[in-house]
Amino acid sequence: MDMIETKALEFAYPAEEGEKPVLALRGVDTAIEKGSFVVVLGHNGSGKSTFAKCLNAILLPCGGKVYVEGMDTQDEACLLEIRRRVGMVFQNPDNQIVANVVEEDVAFAPENLGVASEEIRRRVDDALAAVDMTAFMTHAPH
């Protein structure tokens, strides 16, 4: 089974009043094997980010299907598990900072995965120590 598979994937951004929807993806078929490395290349506005957001269900297709390890991104019951498997690093760091201090930002992911508070504390401390950032624990993340 492929790690990620798309079948005739389509996505259109909603239209402004009086305009047509903007079709960003049309008929995208992809099969990505677990452990493989994939590069998505294209000009600005060609749909690369839209495609990536469809893979982890930040955006849902308006046509076709996206499967992550066999789970359909349009199945609400699978969304958390899909997002555990397909992460995203945004191009602009400001779009991924979610807290006012470094330690809270580092804790965000395990909190959303339901990790116990004591374990989150240990993981945050270990992660900051591993990159020599313990002194910045209570600083703003930017």
Predicted regions and their residues:
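Helix-to-loop junction immediately C-terminal to a conserved catalytic motif
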Residues: 56
